[in-house]
A protein has these predicted regions:
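CheY-like receiver
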Residues: 143, 255-258, 301
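Alpha/beta catalytic cores of group-transfer enzymes, especially the acyltransferase/condensing modules
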Residues: 11-13, 38-40, 100-248
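A short, acidic, amphipathic alpha-helical segment used as a generic capping/interface helix at domain edges
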Residues: 247-264
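FabD-like malonyl-/acyl-CoA
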Residues: 2-139, 185, 189, 266-296
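Short, charged, surface-exposed secondary-structure boundary motifs
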Residues: 297-303
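Non-catalytic positions within long, well-ordered alpha-helices that form the structural scaffold/packing
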Residues: 77, 179, 260-263
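A short, flexible low-complexity segment enriched in Lys/Arg and Gly/Pro that occurs
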Residues: 64-69, 245-252
Length: 303
């Protein structure tokens, strides 16, 4: 029997106008934007559709992306499309939390707004990230360990694409060493800080405090953590892992491999862009994959 996964992208795929077609076509999607706006104390619709100067700033990107993903998810659910499991990359994990009904939507929107602010404010000056293409993970890990300064693996995206993070000078040194060691390319990323590194510990601590007040339930469908790349069912374990996720590597490739090993054979990427679909094809070309970003994608998918 077929097993479907909903997967949700993280920062980087955002664009002005994302979610607008759903907002205009479905009252339920509009309600999601309004609920997110109330929880985040922000006009999220205006942010997503008009505010080009803000959409790429972490403190705004996170609530904008999550709201768009949540609105599309809501419409899919109304169309009767269900999933056996949910996973999301970085901030996308909070959309997976919504899909698995782990927390109340208003709590999730409020949390992601805080997470964006905490991460933006915790950013040390001179942090950087870079994507390393065409190199084995073990070599990258070794170079990071041997480089002088603070540099770490941020994301295990898929075979041949790993992201490093840390102090600008250390990331630059590691990038040069990786090129010398045979990396196909090392591409600096346009981000505002060294995300998913121990340098963001302060943001993790603040998020931990914010999570203390939140009611967390047992997931209704399979829910996987970026930190462990495995299913998590215990509410208290979820509470403790989410703050860790901010300053820990995102084990995305391992998460997808875990789901495939569990018999999941259809993946639906919900939200802006096709980043995760691209990763999936590099992990396993045989797996059926769709992505729903625009209204025409939805029509094509639900027939």
């Amino acid at each position: 029997m077929s097993k479907r996964v909903f997967m949700f992208p993280g920062q980087g795929s955002q664009y002005i106008g994302m979610g607008k077609e759903f907002y205009e076509a479905f009252p339920a999607a509009k309600e999601v934007f309004e609920l997110a706006g109330e929880a985040a104390k922000l006009d999220v619709a205006k942010l997503c559709f008009e505010e080009e100067d803000k959409i790429d700033q972490t403190e705004y990107t996170q609530i904008a992306m999550l709201t768009t993903e949540a609105a599309i998810l809501k419409v899919l659910q109304m169309e009767g499309v269900t999933a056996d499991a949910a996973a999301g990359l970085s901030l996308g994990e909070y959309a997976a939390i919504l899909a698995a009904e782990v927390m109340e939507p208003s709590d999730v929107f409020s949390l992601i707004r805080k997470r964006g602010q905490y991460m933006q404010n915790a950013v040390p000056t001179g942090g950087a990230m870079a994507a390393v293409l065409g190199m084995d993970a073990a070599v990258i890990e070794k170079v990071c360990e041997e480089t002088i300064g603070e540099v770490f693996v941020a994301n295990y995206n898929c075979p041949g694409q790993i992201v490093i993070t840390g102090e600008q000078s250390a990331v630059d040194r590691a990038s040069e060493s990786l090129k010398e060691a045979g990396a196909k390319r090392v591409v600096p990323l346009k981000v505002s800080g060294p995300f998913h590194s121990p340098l963001l510990q302060e943001a993790g601590q603040k998020l931990s405090t914010a999570l203390e007040k939140v009611q967390i339930s047992t997931p209704k469908i399979g829910y996987l953590s970026n930190v462990t790349a495995d299913y998590v069912t215990d509410p208290e374990k979820i509470r403790s892992l989410l703050p860790v996720q901010v300053c820990h590597s995102v084990c995305w490739q391992q998460t997808i491999e875990r789901l495939i090993a569990d018999g999941c054979d259809e993946f639906v990427e919900i939200g802006p862009g096709k980043t995760l679909s691209g990763f999936l094809r590099k992990i396993n070309r045989e797996i059926k994959c769709s992505n729903i970003d625009k209204l025409e994608d939805l029509k094509k998918y639900v027939g």
